[in-house]
């Protein structure tokens, strides 16, 4: 009984944490960096691979996004988290998920988030797209979180690599990397100009 009670209280804490995060998401808007990445689709085929669990890229207008660590606005089965039949997109009025809210297989709903120690199922999809890239862009990441940091190993030899970050980032790679030492918004704007003036468009 004690063990069941502890598990239940742990789920309550987790649900409460993610419920609050969902509410906060309603108060946040995409920034200019998100919008500029979406605008790149006018001239290029763009795939965004993100470690963020928010939906700001979608709201900014990007159409092809791979969420490595899951999505805050979705819930899934606690028994079979990656089964697409039980993954549900929540409307804002459904953001409050409680103990007793069940997935289609009868198990407790849980956030569609990759928790510590769980596998990252979308990494294979990300690798497939990285292997086709003509241009690979790293924005605002320390390159220390795996498996995402390992994507650099799958960039084709003839692809250009850009790093956008206002702070110095130690990237462990023998590949030449074009560094744009600016924030995301200014950096993506500069990147777009560079790409449009070369033969990528």
Each language-model region and where it sits:
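Single conserved hydrophobic/aromatic residue that forms the stacking wall/gate
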Residues: 1-8, 13
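Short, structured coil segments at secondary-structure junctions
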Residues: 7-8, 60-63, 157, 173-176
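Ligand-binding beta-strand-loop-alpha-helix segment within the catalytic cores
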Residues: 10, 14-75, 103
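Short, flexible loop segments at the rims of nucleotide/cofactor-binding pockets, characterized by
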Residues: 23-29, 112-119, 138-141
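Short, conserved clusters of charged catalytic residues that mark active-site
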Residues: 32-35, 121, 146-147
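Conserved beta-strand scaffold positions in the cores of enzyme catalytic domains, especially
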Residues: 48, 65-67, 115, 161-163, ...
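Cys/His-rich short segments
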Residues: 56-124, 128
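SIR2/sirtuin-family catalytic core signature
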Residues: 125-201
